[in-house]
Each structure stands twice: as C-alpha cells, then as structure tokens.
Amino acid sequence: MRVLLAPGGLWPEPAGVPLAGSGPGLAPGHVASCLARGWREVRPHDSLTLLPVADGGPGSAQVIAPEQVASREVIQGRGPLRQVREVDLVRLLPKPTPSGNRRRGEASTWFLDAARLLTLPADPDEAAQEALEGSTSGLGGVIGAALSRTGPLDTLLVGLSRSAVHDGGLGVMDALGGLRVAKDLLSRRSLGLVLADDIALGGMNGAGAALTSITSISPELAQELDRRACSRAMEVVSAAQDLDPGAVGPRRSLPVVSALDDVGPSASEHAPNSAGNARLSASSWGTGAGGGSALLLRALGAWARPGARVMAELVSLSDA
C-alpha cells in the first residue's frame, strides 16, 4: 500500500496558541519521521511518502524541500523589542511543465519566514513587555529588504502568525516609508500574507482580547491597548482608501479575504470590488496576525490566505 504522510508541526499550546519553533515542540519534518518510524514497525512493506507541510508560522521556510529551492539567504531584522533576529528568504524553483521541463525567465515566487521575527514568547512577562513596548517596525524592515531582492513581476509570500506585540501594524507602515510610499510600493508588487493564525485584530475574540491569555497584563490594560491599536490602524485603513488611484466617485470598500476565498499566487492582485463586498476592518478574518500588521498590509494592497493552504500548494501536496 502507498501511504502519504503530510503532517504539520506539534508545539506547546498555552491558552490554545501554538508556540511554534519552541524547544519542546516538533517541527513538521520531525513529526513526519516519527510517524514513518512507527508505521514501518507495524507495516514494513508499505511504500511511504513523507511530505511535511508548514502553515506559515515560525520556521516554515525550513520545511520547504531543498530540491524546490533556487536560492536561500538569511536577512537580519529587529524583533518587537529591537532584539536582533534572523529570518529566511527563499526563492522557489518554478514548477515543471507537463513535459517535465522548467520555464525559463518566468516570474519567481519567494517566501519570507517573517513570523520568526515576531514569534510569541513562552514567558508571559516577556510577552507582556512586547505588548506594552513592542513595535512591528522590524517586520516592515525585512519586508522592504525582501522586496528589494525580488523582481517587479515576482510574488513575495510573507509568513505571519500570532504575536504579543500589538501596535496595529503601525511600525510596519513606518518602516516601509510611511503611508504614501508604502501604498505606492505595494500597489506595484504582488505581496501575499501566509497566515498561520486567522484571528482578527479586534473584537470580543480578537488578538487584543486574547492578550490576557498569552501575557501577564490585566484585562483592563489589554482592553486599552486593543482600543488604541484598532483605532490607529483603522485611521490608516481609511487613509489608504483615500489614496487608492482606482477609486472613482464615492470611496470604495476594500475586499475582505476569508478562509474560504480562492486567493493566492495564481490569482489577480486585487479581488473584484462589487457593491456587496464587506469593508476591511479590525474585526475581519486574519487581521490580527503580526500584531495587526496583516490588517495594514492588506489595506496597502496585499492579499491574504490561510497559511496551511498556501504552503501545501508550494510543496505540491495535491500532486504527491
């Protein structure tokens, strides 16, 4: 019998939030190896294919098989408290044509393991410090560095997950040069957010409300941090719509990408904007990733999609 083993990682989950990349956990490759070892002990004659799949969280770049990688480099960035951290930038080989050849000169797909920059601390007190004092500016810095390495027709995929920092993504925008510069930059590029966590930024079940579970701050302080982050972020979202060169007449609404939307590397840069589209807001799907960076990057022109679906596509799970 032929068997496909395509597991994700196994990580500690205090308060239901995975501490991806932490010491006690198992990366997807290790999970696949353990499953294969146990399977072979019971059914040694089965043919096993191991295809570990990441979800866009910290360490996802390491799960991409070497034979799928055209180049790999490490970019230094700053964490929420300006600590030096390293993230992987991977350029993927183009997928072979039906004849088995690879097309020359076609646009490239890149993956930036940005979630490693804002990884959630295991210590609630350290997480509280990041929530109170942290910034997402380092994320903007590594995204800018990655975009400088990509071509104008390339797609840059950015892995994001839950974090303790909660500045609404303002640091990202500032590091990219401010609203006008960042909007112009992203309007000319294909930037996709690969979300390991689909939590919204605000709301009763949003990232702000969840700060009391993953940090040591009080509910009252978490509420104030969330109110401030959501308010500032939505001011930027509104201003970004005013700058949209495609807007005609009344200000149009930004499309909301959900877990069920078929948006990805092969889709157009912007979804159609019909009158029925919901308005992008702090309570929209996936906007809480990276401390609210997902919300602002989407307002600036990025698309978003569930991380496991994107990573499965990158490793050609459907063809395995």
Segments from the language model and where they lie:
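N-terminal loops that bind phosphate or other acidic moieties
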Residues: 1-320
